[in-house]
């Protein structure tokens, strides 16, 4: 199993070229946050924007719009109850995150199916939180888009039921044709025959919303990097690396504090020579 290291980060995060514009840094759709869990959508969106995604749009319950756009005015918004509008816009995005705070009711399942059905082979879809639970029911067709799952331990137990003959996480990743970010104290990433282990993290990060921030960082960086797996690995590293640094002076590290530091550390790693 390969280690995710600071040296690798220096190669994964490119400097920004002068002759570029917001369209060059990815168009991201985040489908998240029902009436009860709007904070999940906000934390994911904040991490996505601050990881450098060029254009970020959130599809959520309309009650979340004022809070979202007050905190993150850079985000655009789609009322996900207008399912026709959402359906028409799905194809416009490079990367889609679905699941944080989405809920498990019939409407959440309808939206989830819509996103999978409308996604194309040219898109990346990250499935997090409630999205994993819905997908694990086994009632959804495998979409044309490339999938990444971000399960914690409980969600992992549900997800691996889809691959009953699998022995290892690599077996599961191959069986469901997806990348798996298996979250834990030392998060592991499985993609095809390859596997990586993160070397950073701290119990100070054990607080609600941390997974939403990681998912937002993944979709933000995946939208910018040449290879999706590179963006995924970079996000896993940065999320824990920043958390560990902040924990040196904090008993608990909040997800929003990690998001706030993303631009600073992205700049540091983008300007550090990997051979130094």
Swiss-Prot record:
<feature type="binding site">
    <location>
        <position position="212"/>
    </location>
    <ligand>
        <name>(6S)-NADPHX</name>
    </ligand>
</feature>
<keyword id="KW-0521">NADP</keyword>
<dbReference type="InterPro" id="IPR000631">
    <property type="entry name" value="CARKD"/>
</dbReference>
<dbReference type="Pfam" id="PF01256">
    <property type="entry name" value="Carb_kinase"/>
</dbReference>
<dbReference type="InterPro" id="IPR029056">
    <property type="entry name" value="Ribokinase-like"/>
</dbReference>
<protein>
    <recommendedName>
        <fullName>ADP-dependent (S)-NAD(P)H-hydrate dehydratase</fullName>
        <ecNumber>4.2.1.136</ecNumber>
    </recommendedName>
</protein>
<dbReference type="GO" id="GO:0052855">
    <property type="term" value="F:ADP-dependent NAD(P)H-hydrate dehydratase activity"/>
</dbReference>
<feature type="binding site">
    <location>
        <position position="152"/>
    </location>
    <ligand>
        <name>(6S)-NADPHX</name>
    </ligand>
</feature>
<dbReference type="InterPro" id="IPR017953">
    <property type="entry name" value="Carbohydrate_kinase_pred_CS"/>
</dbReference>
<dbReference type="GO" id="GO:0052856">
    <property type="term" value="F:NAD(P)HX epimerase activity"/>
</dbReference>
<keyword id="KW-0456">Lyase</keyword>
<feature type="binding site">
    <location>
        <position position="103"/>
    </location>
    <ligand>
        <name>(6S)-NADPHX</name>
    </ligand>
</feature>
<feature type="binding site">
    <location>
        <position position="40"/>
    </location>
    <ligand>
        <name>(6S)-NADPHX</name>
    </ligand>
</feature>
<comment type="function">
    <text>Catalyzes the dehydration of the S-form of NAD(P)HX at the expense of ADP, which is converted to AMP. Together with NAD(P)HX epimerase, which catalyzes the epimerization of the S- and R-forms, the enzyme allows the repair of both epimers of NAD(P)HX, a damaged form of NAD(P)H that is a result of enzymatic or heat-dependent hydration.</text>
</comment>
<keyword id="KW-0547">Nucleotide-binding</keyword>
<keyword id="KW-0520">NAD</keyword>
<feature type="binding site">
    <location>
        <position position="211"/>
    </location>
    <ligand>
        <name>AMP</name>
    </ligand>
</feature>
<dbReference type="GO" id="GO:0110051">
    <property type="term" value="P:metabolite repair"/>
</dbReference>
<keyword id="KW-0067">ATP-binding</keyword>
<feature type="domain" description="YjeF C-terminal">
    <location>
        <begin position="5"/>
        <end position="269"/>
    </location>
</feature>
<dbReference type="GO" id="GO:0005524">
    <property type="term" value="F:ATP binding"/>
</dbReference>
<comment type="similarity">
    <text>Belongs to the NnrD/CARKD family.</text>
</comment>
<comment type="subunit">
    <text>Homotetramer.</text>
</comment>
<dbReference type="GO" id="GO:0046496">
    <property type="term" value="P:nicotinamide nucleotide metabolic process"/>
</dbReference>
